[in-house]
Swiss-Prot record:
Main location: cytoplasm
Record gene name: rsmA
HAMAP family: 16SrRNA_methyltr_A
InterPro entries: KsgA/Erm, rRNA_Ade_diMease-like_C, rRNA_Ade_Mease_Trfase_CS, rRNA_Ade_methylase_Trfase_N, rRNA_adenine_dimethylase, SAM-dependent_MTases_sf
PROSITE patterns per UniProt: RRNA_A_DIMETH, SAM_RNA_A_N6_MT
Protein name per the record: Ribosomal RNA small subunit methyltransferase A
SMART domains linked: rADc
EC code: 2.1.1.182
Keyword Transferase set for record: yes
Reaction(s) catalysed by this chain's protein: adenosine(1518)/adenosine(1519) in 16S rRNA + 4 S-adenosyl-L-methionine = N(6)-dimethyladenosine(1518)/N(6)-dimethyladenosine(1519) in 16S rRNA + 4 S-adenosyl-L-homocysteine + 4 H(+)
Family: Belongs to the class I-like SAM-binding methyltransferase superfamily. rRNA adenine N(6)-methyltransferase family. RsmA subfamily.
Gene3D superfamilies in UniProt: Ribosomal RNA adenine dimethylase-like, domain 2, Vaccinia Virus protein VP39
Alphabetized Pfam families for the sequence: RrnaAD
MF GO annotations: 16S rRNA (adenine(1518)-N(6)/adenine(1519)-N(6))-dimethyltransferase activity; RNA binding
């Protein structure tokens, strides 16, 4: 492959260590659906994926696309590989985002857009599972469980859609150019379609979690009482057996759902509003 200089604006750090490439391949969700790679890079992971999967690959760098089309010309001609030159963040997500049928994703995500992409994969009902590599600290947030200090709004959103599992770390020395941080690979398997949360509830949940985790060192009750009526909170906390001094990271995902449902129900009765009360919402 022709010599290529990485571009900082695309957050390009290419994984080229064969040991970790093989570990990723061995960890891919075993689901017989279309496999999609986000960010092809120099094609090292792509080459390994093509040994076991037909592949749709999205790449935002036109210079790389030209090089990759030459490198994988045989696989492209045979229909085993389809390289799409697109910025996926600019693709509409009202219906299908990356594919019109069920799919799974394998990707070494650029650090600066990793969270955004993962959240869109969670929302896309055609995406059934994904294995991604991100900065270690980001991976810890997505994979954290109740009681862990890393447990946050992102953790709750993941548990609302499926189950996350941390797999392994990848040292910065495995990349070229070498990043300043350690990376981690994790996988998320999403629940079946009938167990997916409704879009309208998801929108409210995201707003609600911003309030719940607004000040992590304060109690959940204190954070929520900046927006919601204290008597209603006392009632729902008692229903959920949540102590008044509990912090948000100590509360289970199901309880967040139940609290929100309770407040939404009262809102429907005209007694409470989710996004605005006589008190100002934290900014």
């Amino acid at each position: 492959m022709e010599e290529y200089r990485s571009k900082k604006r695309f957050g390009q750090n290419f994984l080229q260590d064969s040991h970790f490439l093989h570990k990723i391949i061995q960890s891919i969700p075993d689901i017989p659906i279309q496999c999609i790679e986000i960010g092809v890079g120099l094609g090292d992971l792509t080459q390994e994926l093509l040994k076991i999967e037909s592949l749709i690959a999205y790449e935002v760098d036109l210079d790389l696309c030209s090089l990759l089309n030459k490198k994988f010309s045989n696989q492209i001609q045979s229909g085993r590989l389809n390289i799409i030159y697109k910025d996926i963040l600019n693709l509409p997500s009202q219906q299908a985002w990356l594919h019109t049928h069920e799919y799974k994703v394998v990707s070494n995500l650029p650090y600066y857009i990793a969270t955004h992409i993962i959240l869109r994969l969670l929302r896309d009902r055609f995406c059934r599972a994904f294995l991604v590599m991100t900065q270690k600290e980001v991976a810890q947030k997505f994979c954290a469980t109740t009681g862990q200090k890393e447990f946050c709004a992102l953790s709750v959103l993941v548990e609302s859609f499926g189950k996350a599992k941390m797999l392994f770390e990848v040292p910065k020395e495995a990349f070229s150019p070498m990043p300043k941080v350690t990376s981690s690979v994790f996988v998320i398997h999403k629940y079946s379609q009938q167990n997916q949360i409704e879009d309208s509830f998801l929108c409210d949940l995201e707003s609600f979690l911003k309030i719940a985790f607004y000040a992590p060192r304060k109690t959940l009750f204190k954070n929520l009482s900046q927006v919601f009526d204290k008597k209603l909170l006392e009632e729902v906390f008692e229903n959920e057996n949540i102590k008044s001094n509990a912090r948000a990271h100590e509360v289970k995902t199901k309880s967040f759902h139940h609290i929100l449902q309770f407040l939404k129900k009262r809102n429907d009765n005209g007694k409470q509003t989710l996004t605005r009360t006589t008190k100002q919402r934290p900014s």
